[in-house]
Each structure stands twice: as structure tokens, then as C-alpha cells.
Amino acid sequence: MHKKRVEEGEASDFSLAWDSSVTAAGGLEGEPECDQKTSRALEDRNSVTSQEERNEDDEDMEDESIYTCDHCQQDFESLADLTDHRAHRCPGDGDDDPQLSWVASSPSSKDVASPTQMIGDGCDLGLGEEEGGTGLPYPCQFCDKSFIRLSYLKRHEQIHSDKLPFKCTYCSRLFKHKRSRDRHIKLHTGDKKYHCHECEAAFSRSDHLKIHLKTHSSSKPFKCTVCKRGFSSTSSLQSHMQAHKKNKEHLAKSEKEAKKDDFMCDYCEDTFSQTEELEKHVLTRHPQLSEKADLQCIHCPEVFVDENTLLAHIHQAHANQKHKCPMCPEQFSSVEGVYCHLDSHRQPDSSNHSVSPDPVLGSVASMSSATPDSSASVERGSTPDSTLKPLRGQKKMRDDGQGWTKVVYSCPYCSKRDFNSLAVLEIHLKTIHADKPQQSHTCQICLDSMPTLYNLNEHVRKLHKNHAYPVMQFGNISAFHCNYCPEMFADINSLQEHIRVSHCGPNANPSDGNNAFFCNQCSMGFLTESSLTEHIQQAHCSVGSAKLESPVVQPTQSFMEVYSCPYCTNSPIFGSILKLTKHIKENHKNIPLAHSKKSKAEQSPVSSDVEVSSPKRQRLSASANSISNGEYPCNQCDLKFSNFESFQTHLKLHLELLLRKQACPQCKEDFDSQESLLQHLTVHYMTTSTHYVCESCDKQFSSVDDLQKHLLDMHTFVLYHCTLCQEVFDSKVSIQVHLAVKHSNEKKMYRCTACNWDFRKEADLQVHVKHSHLGNPAKAHKCIFCGETFSTEVELQCHITTHSKKYNCKFCSKAFHAIILLEKHLREKHCVFDAATENGTANGVPPMATKKAEPADLQGMLLKNPEAPNSHEASEDDVDASEPMYGCDICGAAYTMEVLLQNHRLRDHNIRPGEDDGSRKKAEFIKGSHKCNVCSRTFFSENGLREHLQTHRGPAKHYMCPICGERFPSLLTLTEHKVTHSKSLDTGTCRICKMPLQSEEEFIEHCQMHPDLRNSLTGFRCVVCMQTVTSTLELKIHGTFHMQKLAGSSAASSPNGQGLQKLYKCALCLKEFRSKQDLVKLDVNGLPYGLCAGCMARSANGQVGGLAPPEPADRPCAGLRCPECSVKFESAEDLESHMQVDHRDLTPETSGPRKGTQTSPVPRKKTYQCIKCQMTFENEREIQIHVANHMIEEGINHECKLCNQMFDSPAKLLCHLIEHSFEGMGGTFKCPVCFTVFVQANKLQQHIFAVHGQEDKIYDCSQCPQKFFFQTELQNHTMSQHAQ
């Protein structure tokens, strides 16, 4: 068996092949109308199927397929765009595209399952472009490749099987979504529920049907007779018809070129130039495919050419196996005995009973074994030899029917067709196709099932040997012929489909004049008389005779009657009335059988109520006795006719009655077509219900909620993801074990219960206890605010005064820790700017001088100047002095009701009403460790501290000063602040013309005399400080400010300015004294305090000089600090020189009242302070030498004790400690003194060095006199300096 190489793809349809031959011979004009309908129906169906395969979508419903033009390779997102492009703008072809049998037949770029499939289909795309590259417009979402076309990208994505979890069970194509896979499977299952009402086309999607309906639009009245496509003009139709002609010429050319191709092996696809080489190759490499290799091993699928090779193979490969007959239970001692016994299964025995296949079995054996379905019958997938052979030169069969020709069997699973006996076929099935499911073989006469073909042969030979049921010999007739046209088909399924499509439509009538030519010998129908004459010459004339036989010659062959079910949509064909009856009883219960016989009166052809079966029959038959008597019986009504013409006329009446009306068996309603009847009949039997099916276990649920609950309970896995190492675990226990093993770094912290300090090492805690608690056992007095201990009650009372707010506002009774906070409060809340004489912080005076200046009586200042513009303003936070206030003795918070105070004490200090002071102190000790830098309140959590800090920030400040960068909540406060940057002298003199100004009116009028041309807003500027003003209000504020300064300076120089005198308070009894001489100066932890004589007498107990705690031996320099500013000095001479220069007014000889003529204090010399030890130096060289000594002794590495990070300078360490202080604060850094906000820690550090001095530091070290701005500085200092 030799086969030439052919193109891969689907085999051409028989009807299309016959149509092509007729068209080539007679042209399109001679094509009959019914055959045109047949060809169009098949072409439409094929085009629809291919289109649905191409247009399958693998994305969301909104993301439809990408459609590519065949000519210009341009991609489109929808079929409508592609249709418009090909109809109007495509340069390659417009209306004459032969592939556009309907609009949506353009291939989709998503239709490619693999590159090899595309190449096999004849794709001529460049391999270099398909491989992809980089920088191309369509990148892959799973890898780094990109492609020049979207179709290449979709083809490439199929290799990412791990990203496409859903797979088609038919073609192994991969999909990203399940819904895309389900839509694709419809292409394989043929689920097409959208039907065209104009033609027989069906679609699985509604959008495809809508596009197809455009071809039937009335706007395109000119229809193509081949593909039924509509056109708007005759010229377009003629151009389209030329495309059909070119397509047929191309097919003819391709067939001619295919004959010149090399010969290809069917098994390994090797090609050979000569048939002899192909035969030699098949014999040596694939003996199972060769016709000469007919010796098969009884144990395995191997096939051999000669007996010696077969016997050698059995002795080598199957020497230990028993030699058993595959057809029966007998066993033999040698291989030769097995093969001799196998001959008895196919040779006649001594009793002359033929053991060869029975004629009945020969007609149906291969058909019944053709399908792997155990319940399949002859009408489903029979496999006689499908190769169409011409029916020429066939000899007539003998009338006695005894000369049966040899039956050839074919395998239903492979291309092997030539099996001389059932035994050989059975061996082939059991060895080569052992993996196939076991199937039963049905007897065509009694419908009994047999396990093997051999058993079926024996059954037919014994039970149905004399059965008179006529059968057709497939060994002699190689094809099935249609009764209504010259079409031939290889199997019954193709014949049944052809009859249903071509001859059972609403317009198809096989009884018209063109189909009235039937052969008298075999009852085959033909279109023309010439075709009938040619058929008789070829099929029913002897080889040597050229004359036509008489049309009345009786047929000598037996034919098989074919019955079709009238209730099924696909009209299956059955070989016997028994099988049809069984089919109706199983599938159409309670429906009367259409083939039930009636009385002869009811069977009259004249009656219009005759019920007949479907006209789809493969052969017209008659019994042998009737034919021999010259009668033609009708198998529909049992009438007999003497000649063939009468019989043919009678049969046409049956067909006309059947096609005229079809009645519903339930309600007797008539319908024009079987499809309409089926749709109507379905309504009688149909009940609809909605169920939701689980894809995994196929369980059904009545609601979506039940399905989701089932999926969550049965098919959902909860995974636990470790955010530290990104590992995933399937149970809670697993991740707990993982966290305990890998991420549980146990680290002990040692806390001092007395002062709540934490230490990383036990040795550090021991050092802390040694220096802080063990060395001072007599310090029993502890501060309830900071936990510091003192030896006596006097020292504790002196220390408590440091927690009070020293600077009080005279307007609203508010108190502040630092003078700068009081000044800021006065400017923002009370709009008081004259701070030179009243608050001791005049512009231009160094910060150290503010401490020496006496606080002013602001109320007296307002009495002197009642016209001050801001004296009437009151703050929202002002407290009415007339209401009774209840203050908290722990944090100083004041409330108007006692209940509010009790709630505050319970919420913030955990002190319940009625508890004594001991419980309060105990609760204070266990108070939280998060301390507010503004009001010193503590909190248990960082979140509580963060919420508390929001109360200090006040309203949003959107107006920033262009000079210092400070922000203000309103434009008015910003304007008042900008005035404070004035650097003019106290003389209200114009800096342009030197004219003195005495009042605000003079100032405003004089400013108009010197306009500022650069100021586009107002055109003016302040003539005293030369600042640009943005509004008239700002100019008035400048005038008020400068005139107040002038009045204040004159008041300070007048004798009346000496009336204000500072009062000094005792630190213990808080009594006020007019002179410092009335108080005794004490030094407690490096800070100066004053006690009156009475307190000293009551508390000293004879130890006046022992009030100050003794200095430890390891602090020799603790006493060399300035008692006023706490600056450390290395020698007593330096301290004395510092006191003479910087604190001359406080020395005994100058401690009296200051002279009235002195208007400004002595300016302080510029000093340099070490960041590490806070020592002060007079020049830069000395501090450089000091820093060098630090580097020599301690090295250049400075460690942060909080996180063990190293830095190469103390400044960087200080900046790092500032970052520690503001961790979790949103990336903002706020000055603890003036509350200016910065976004960088180094900016805050620069701000502290430039603006604030030693007196503004908040946190004091309990073991040395050093002070710090931040608590983290104090912690790092304690752990590094006092832990040893």
C-alpha cells in the first residue's frame, strides 16, 4: 500500500469533491440547484466551524479576540472593525476574497495552539519574527520576550504552561481563565444553539450569528450562488465570482503538483523518490504496515515477513511463555502447533460447514467493531474500507448466492485494513490495541452481543445459517449511494448527514423532475438520463458486451433495507426494523412507531392521511420472491406494482405527503419542517431548572450561596504567609513552628525596678545599681516626677521646683518651662511684641542676657499704653479667673469641675477617688515610660503619646515666614511675627532721609513719600527697617511696633523705669524677699537654690554646711561649674574669670541694684563648647586641641548604645540620637524648646546649635551636671559614661 504525501489538515468532503468535478466539466452555469444548496450548506458549516475555532477567546468577556487581516496582516480588536477594513480599506482584496464566505471567517491571532501546528497548516510566517526579541511593541507578560505582532505573542504564551492552568481535553490548548476554556470546548462538542433563520448555519456565540446575519441584509440584494454572500452591486458580485473561479483553478493546480511530490512513509514521514525504496523501507523499518508482512506474533504486536524470522523472534523473546490459541482456550506444546490450529479457525472443516465468516456477519462484522463504544450499533461509525473505488468492471453475482467472495476485515483503530480472517483481526486487536476498552459485537439479526468477533461468527453460522433476511455484501459494494442524487459515501453516517442537509430542507424536494431517473437493476437515482445510461453500461453490462441490458431485467443482487428514526434531529439510520424498534422503545417512550402497518384501505396512495417514514433511505429493496415474480412491493404500505415506472410514481406520492406536513404526536399540530416539529415537541417534554455545579466533585446546588459555601468548606486551602522570609505554610501549627525556630531571637532585657531603666546586659545593670543605689543608701526621698532620689526633704523640695513652669503669663495664668515659650505665647495669643524691657529678651541681645534681665510687669506696660492695638485680644484657651479651678498635683492640669479632675486622675494616672498619697506614688512609679517633651506627661504606649502630641501642635500653620521659616496659622500672626525681625535702632528715624518720626500717623504719611517701585502689591516699604510690606495692615503694624519701641526705650531711660523690682523666693517655703542677701545660696546637683534663714534653721539640724551632697571621688571637676549657667571649667582661675566677665552683676561687689543709666548689659564673649563633654573654650584653637585629645583617648568611633551603631564623629551621633527620639512620628522633627518643625534631623540639629543655649536644655543627668535636649541623649550618655 503506497500513499503519496499530502498536506496536513482535514480531508475534503465527498460532496465538495463531486461538486468540483461537475463544475470543472460543466461550469458553474450547469450546476443543478439542489447540488448548489448541498455545496453551500457544507461550505457554510465548515466555514462556521473553522471560524468558531479561530474566534475563541482566552481572556475576559470584555477582552474579545484579536482579529488579523489575511492580506495586510493588520490586527483589529473586533469583528466589526475587521469587516469594515476588508470591505473598504484593505489594499489586498475587497469583496472578491474567496475566504470570506461569511464576514467573520478571518482567522484570529489567538487561534494558534502551538507553532508546530501553524507550520503544519501551511503558515508561511518568518521563524525569526516568531521567536521574538527585545524592544518590540508586544511584550510577553510572563517573560522578557516581545514580538512584532500580537498573533506571535499569543502563540508564544502557550509555552508558559505554569501560567495557564486550564487545559482543553480535546486539543491540549492552554487557557488562563476557565470561562475561556469552556467557550473553546464548545467548538469540539458542537454546541451551537444560535441558528440563522435564513440558512442552516449555526453558531455557538450570539455575536458570531449577528455578524453572519449581515450577509443576509436587504442592503446587499445581490447574492452569490455559491456561498450566499450578499453584495451591494453587480460589479462586486462579479468580482467575487472570479475569486471562486481562481480558487478552483488553484485547487486543480495543487492536485497536479501533489502528484509530482515524493512518496512519504505514513509512519515516520520519511520521503522517497521511488516506490521501490518506500516498499523496502516499510519492510525493514515498519513491517506492521506492509502488505507482505502478514505473519504476526501471538504474544506481541510484532509482524514478520517470513516464518523463520517469526519463529526466531518467539524463541528469543517469548521462550518462557505458554503457547495458547488467542481464539479459544486450547494450549499447545510448540509454536507450530498454535499456527496450525489457527488455520482451522479460518479453513472449512470436514463436515463442509463453513467456518469462514458468514455472509450476514461479513456485511456487518467490521461495522459492529468499528466503534469503541460498547453500546454502539451499525449506524454509529461503521468502518468498511473508506477508500472510494470506481464501480467499473464488476461482474454480476450468481443468482443462487453461493459464490461469496472473500471478506476482508479492517481494524477500527488504525489504518490496517487487510485482515483475511477474524482470527488475525482478533490477534491484532489484543496485541497492538490492548489499551483500548473492551467492546461487544452485536448481531445484526437478533441484536445479541458477543464478546469477540469469533464468537459472533460462530453465533451467526449456527443460529442464522438459513435466515432469509436479505443483507448487503460490503465486499462487493464499496460505497453507499444516495437515492436522490449521484452522491456516494464511505459510511452510513456520511449518507445520513447528507440526506438530512441536502434533501430534507423546506425547499428540497427529491421528487421533482430532475431526480426521477432510477436504475431498474439497483434502484439508484440519477439526475439526468445520460447519467443513468452511463451507470447501466458500467455497472450492469458484461465485460465483453457494449449493449445496454433491458430495463426490465430483474436484479440479481440482494440489498439491505435501511430505516430511519422519524423523531431524532439527526435522523439515525438502522439496518433492520428490530433495531429501529429497540431504538424507539429506549429513546422515545410513549410515542407510536411510525413504521406500524395499517390496513390496505388506509395504505392507499390516494389517501391524504397516510403516515409514512422519512424518505432518507439508502436503498430501495424488495424480497427475492417478489422480484422473481416481476412485482415491486412498497415497503411503506405493502402495495405491489407490476412495472418499475408505476412503483416509482407511487413512491413519489409518499415523499410528497411526508414533506407536505408533519404532525405533532401530542397535540396533532402540523408543521412544515422537522426542525419546527422538534422545537415544538421539545416544549411538551421540557422542564427547566437552574443548578450550580461544582467543577471538582460534580455536586449540584440550588443556589449560588450553597455552592460558595461548599467551595469554601471542601475545596479551599488556607495558607499562612511569613512576611519575614516569604515562606508559605499550609497550617497554623507549621507557621508557629517556623516562627519559633527561625525568627524567635530571644533577647533578655534587665530593668531596674527603682528607676525603670532598661539594660541589655546584666553587668550594665549591676554597674547602675552600684553607682545609683548601692553607694547612696540614705537617699530615701524620691521625686515622683522623674524618680530621682535625695538625702533630705529640702533637697527634694528644691528639686521639685525644677518641674514647675517658671515663666507665667500675666494675661491668662498659663506657665511655661522656658522664656522663649512665654515670648512666643505672648506674640501669638496676646500680640505683645515689646520684649526688650518687659521680658528681658530685646532684639540684638545675646540669649545669655535674657537670664539676667528681670521679668517685666506686662500688666503695667498695658496700663501705660492703653492704645496698644492688641490689648483687647483674648485667646481661646484663656481661663476665667472667676471660676474655681481644680488642679492635678501630679501633672498640673486644671479643670473647672472636681468630677473632671477625678476622671483625669483615673484615666492618666490610674488613681481612683479616695486613694491616699501612698497609692498615688505607687501608681506613679508604674506609670508608662513614654514621656511628652513639652509637658513631661508619661504614657503607657507610643500611640497614646502620639495622640497627646497632637494637642500641642494646635491649628494647621500654612503661612511661613520668608526670613526664619517658621509657620503661622493666619496671615495676621505672620505679619506680626515679621516685625520682630526688624534690626533698626530704638530711634524712630527714617533710614532714607534721617527724619525723626514721633507717631504712627507720621510714619504712614512719611512711608508714602518714599514709594518702593519694586513692590507691585502696595508700592510701599517700611522706612525704618526697610522691609517690604504686602498690605496696608502690615504697614500699620510696622508703625505701631516701631513707635512702641521708641516709647519703651524712653521709658527705660527715665527715672520712672526704676520702679519695678524683682522679688526672690525661698525654695522651701516660697516666701518672697526683695534682696538676694536674705537668702542662703545652696548647690544641689550643680544647680543654685536659695533658702531663707528660717528654713535653714528648721531643716539644717546643726548641719548647715552639709546640705549639699558630697561629691563622689570620681568627679573631681564637678565643682568647677558656673553656678549661673552651669558651664564647666578645668581650673578655678577660669571659673573666676568667667564670673567676673559674664556675671559681674551677680558678684558680691556688684550685686546691688543696677544703675539706671545702664541701657544694655555687657556683651558676652564668644565661646566654643564640646559636644562630647560640654566643656566651654574661649577660642577655636583650644577646642580643637581638646577634641584632638578626645580622639586620642577614645578613638574616632562613637557608638550608639541604643542600637550599637557606630559613627565617626559626635555630631553624627547626636543627629542619629535625634532620629531615635522621633521614630514613628511620620518623618517630622520638632524642636523641644520652640516646637519648630523640620523634615530632616540635621536641620533640627543646626537649629538647636544656632538658636538655643545651655539654659534651654530640658533633661538633666542625675549623676553629673550635664544637660541634654533629648531623652535619647540622656540615655546614651548614662549607658556610656556611668555604666562603668
Curated annotation (Swiss-Prot):
Q: What is the effect of changing residue 458 to A?
A: Abolishes the ability to bind promoter of BMP target genes
> Basic and acidic residues composition bias: which ranges?
34-46, 1136-1147
Which Pfam family, an example, fits this chain? Answer: zf-C2H2_6
Zinc finger (C2H2-type) stretch: 67-93, 138-160, 166-188, 194-216, 222-244, 263-286, 295-318, 323-345, 409-433, 441-464, 480-503, 517-540, 563-588, 632-654, 662-684, 692-715, 720-743, 750-773, 781-803, 807-830, 886-908, 930-952, 959-981, 1020-1042, 1064-1082, 1120-1143, 1168-1190, 1198-1220, 1229-1252, 1259-1282
An example Gene Ontology CC term for this record: nucleus
Where in the cell?
Nucleus
- Which GO biological process annotations does it have? cell differentiation; negative regulation of cold-induced thermogenesis; negative regulation of DNA-templated transcription; nervous system development; Notch signaling pathway; positive regulation of BMP signaling pathway; positive regulation of DNA-templated transcription; protein localization to cilium
| Composition bias, Low complexity | 363-377, 604-615
Swapping residue 581 to A leads to an effect described as: Abolishes the ability to bind promoter of BMP target genes
Query: What effect is documented for mutating residue 528 to A?
Result: Abolishes the ability to bind promoter of BMP target genes
> What domain of life does the native source organism fall in?
Eukaryota
UniProt keywords, alphabetically:
Activator, Ciliopathy, Developmental protein, Differentiation, Disease variant, DNA-binding, Joubert syndrome, Metal-binding, Nephronophthisis, Neurogenesis, Nucleus, Phosphoprotein, Repeat, Repressor, Transcription, Transcription regulation, Zinc, Zinc-finger
Entry coiled-coil feature ranges = none
Polar residues bias located where?
Answer: 102-117
Q: Where is the composition biased (Acidic residues)?
A: 54-64
Q: Name one GO molecular function term.
A: sequence-specific DNA binding
Q: Which residues carry this modification: Phosphoserine?
A: 47, 50, 604, 1054
- Family annotation (SMART domains): ZnF_C2H2
Q: Relate the outcome reported for changing residue 420 to A.
A: Abolishes the ability to bind promoter of BMP target genes
Could you say which tissues express the protein in this record? Expressed in brain, lung, skeletal muscle, heart, pancreas and kidney but not liver or placenta. Also expressed in aorta, ovary, pituitary, small intestine, fetal brain, fetal kidney and, within the adult brain, in the substantia nigra, medulla, amygdala, thalamus and cerebellum.
Record's comment describing the protein's domains = Uses different DNA- and protein-binding zinc fingers to regulate the distinct BMP-Smad and Olf signaling pathways. C2H2-type zinc fingers 14-19 mediate the interaction with SMAD1 and SMAD4, while zinc fingers 28-30 mediate the interaction with EBF1. zinc fingers 2-8 bind the 5'-CCGCCC-3' DNA sequence in concert with EBF1, while zinc fingers 9-13 bind BMP target gene promoters in concert with SMADs.
Illness the protein is tied to: Nephronophthisis 14: An autosomal recessive disorder manifesting as infantile-onset kidney disease, cerebellar vermis hypoplasia, and situs inversus. Nephronophthisis is a progressive tubulo-interstitial kidney disorder histologically characterized by modifications of the tubules with thickening of the basement membrane, interstitial fibrosis and, in the advanced stages, medullary cysts. Joubert syndrome 19: A form of Joubert syndrome, a disorder presenting with cerebellar ataxia, oculomotor apraxia, hypotonia, neonatal breathing abnormalities and psychomotor delay. Neuroradiologically, it is characterized by cerebellar vermian hypoplasia/aplasia, thickened and reoriented superior cerebellar peduncles, and an abnormally large interpeduncular fossa, giving the appearance of a molar tooth on transaxial slices (molar tooth sign). JBTS19 patients have polycystic kidney disease, Leber congenital amaurosis, cerebellar vermis hypoplasia, and breathing abnormality.
What is the annotated quaternary arrangement, including any partners?
A: Homodimer. Interacts with EBF1. Interacts with SMAD1 and SMAD4. Interacts with PARP1. Interacts with CEP290.
What the protein does comes down to: Transcription factor that can both act as an activator or a repressor depending on the context. Plays a central role in BMP signaling and olfactory neurogenesis. Associates with SMADs in response to BMP2 leading to activate transcription of BMP target genes. Acts as a transcriptional repressor via its interaction with EBF1, a transcription factor involved in terminal olfactory receptor neurons differentiation; this interaction preventing EBF1 to bind DNA and activate olfactory-specific genes.
Give the protein's recorded name. Answer: Zinc finger protein 423
Q: Which organism is it from?
A: Homo sapiens (Human)
